[in-house]
Swiss-Prot record:
S-adenosyl-L-methionine binds at residues 183, 211, 216, 232, 292. This is tRNA/tmRNA (uracil-C(5))-methyltransferase. InterPro entries: MeTrfase_TrmA_AS, MeTrfase_TrmA_CS, SAM-dependent_MTases_sf, TrmA_MeTrfase, U5_MeTrfase_fam. One of its GO terms (molecular function) is tRNA binding. HAMAP family: RNA_methyltr_TrmA. The gene is trmA. Dual-specificity methyltransferase that catalyzes the formation of 5-methyluridine at position 54 (m5U54) in all tRNAs, and that of position 341 (m5U341) in tmRNA (transfer-mRNA). Its EC number is 2.1.1.-, 2.1.1.35. Belongs to the class I-like SAM-binding methyltransferase superfamily. RNA M5U methyltransferase family. TrmA subfamily. GO terms for biological process: tRNA methylation. NCBIfam families: trmA_only.
Length: 359
């Protein structure tokens, strides 16, 4: 695969045209386009291991053929740190039976700030020999090492990496736990955060955030409003978000572990939730809602919930479901801002953002 600028520009223009066509029925403005580095943009990578000629190799499989491995020596789309670590880790397992025995998968997680973690997955219990070898590996490579085996986990160092991103002239620190979702393209993520920060603007009222994850958007957006009520269902993400709020001294956010559907019931006073004890929903003066839903988009009830708000800031990883949600809201809201974020260069996937404002 070649990574030349001309091919990249052609692919990016195709994505812009696709987004433009999907949003054309809603009189959307021309999208702002945020491009990606051509290489070394991906901060995480996962490889299976494949034995050939008595040696284990990094391997991946194409979506069309799950049986034939593609052996990998380097991975140009991954961060420079991952590419530096790959041969050193391979040399380490080749020289160490405790590290290599029944090792079947390796995961790397890195950050723009230079932090790194390696997860090693095994088809066997981990013993003291593994622990000693993994501790030496962590020291040699200056990384945290996680060992996984049948639901058990051994941690050498930390079970998270720390990312630092600049938004609106302020640097935010993010704890990103092993196994939790993080944005894979750090450079584009930072551009996306700054776009959302500018799109929301300085406000005197409150923000509702659905699907807040580890607080990726929550931290900078909280500095633009009076108060934030944020929801997330993943316990790992909730704990990371709480840690990130504390670490960054952001004290105007209340985080509740509810699904978007449950929050809709709570706001409609359908039934009480124990997890909302101590939260006075009537004290909020919501002017805006921020949503970053999964690929399926918002379900119809959640979409109706967002209609209550004058401003809907929507980040989408699936432009088709974004368009379907906008179609539901189009009679009351219009697109005033639109953006394409090329989180996934060299694929057909794209991230997009819109600001919908009440007519």
């Amino acid at each position: 695969m070649t990574f030349d600028a001309a091919s990249y520009t052609t692919q990016l223009n195709d994505k812009v045209a696709r987004l433009r066509d999907l949003l054309a029925p809603f009189d959307a403005p021309e999208p702002q386009v945020f491009d990606s580095p051509l290489q070394n943009f991906r901060l995480r990578a996962e490889f299976r291991l494949w034995r050939e000629a008595g040696e284990r190799h990094y391997a991946m499989f194409s979506q069309d053929d799950k049986r034939t491995p593609i052996l990998i020596e380097e991975f140009p789309i991954a961060s420079q740190r991952i590419n530096q670590l790959m041969p050193r880790l391979k040399a380490a397992w080749q020289a160490s039976a405790p590290l290599s025995h029944k090792l079947f998968q390796v995961e790397f997680l890195t950050t723009l700030a230079g932090d790194a973690m390696i997860t090693l997955c095994y088809h066997r219990p981990l013993d003291e020999h593994w622990h000693k070898a993994a501790s030496q590996l962590a020291a040699d490579l200056k990384v945290s090492v996680i060992g996984r085996s049948k639901g058990k986990r051994e941690v050498i160092g930390q079970d998270y990496v720390v990312e630092k991103l600049e938004v609106g002239g302020r640097t935010f620190s993010y704890r990103q736990p092993e196994g939790a979702f993080t944005q894979p393209n750090g450079t584009v993520n930072q551009k996306m955060l700054n776009w959302a920060y500018e799109a929301l603007g300085e406000r005197q009222d409150d923000l509702l955030e659905l699907y807040c994850g580890n607080g990726n958007f929550t931290l900078p957006l909280a500095t633009r409003v009076r108060k934030v009520l944020a929801t997330e269902i993943s316990k790992t993400s909730v704990n990371a978000a709480l840690s990130n709020l504390s670490e960054n001294a952001v004290d105007n956010v209340t985080l509740v572990r509810l699904s978007a559907e449950e929050l809709t019931e709570a706001l409609n006073e359908v039934r009480p939730f124990r997890r909302l004890q101590g939260v006075d929903l009537k004290s909020y003066e919501f002017g805006s809602v921020f949503v970053d839903p999964p690929r399926a988009g918002m379900d119809p009830d959640t979409c109706e919930l967002t209609r209550r708000f004058d401003n809907i800031l929507y980040i989408s990883c699936n432009p088709e479901t974004l368009a379907a949600n906008i179609a539901q809201l189009h009679d009351t809201h219009r697109i005033t801002r639109c953006a394409l974020f090329d989180q996934f260069p060299w694929t057909h996937h794209m991230e997009s953002g819109v600001l919908l404002t009440r007519r």
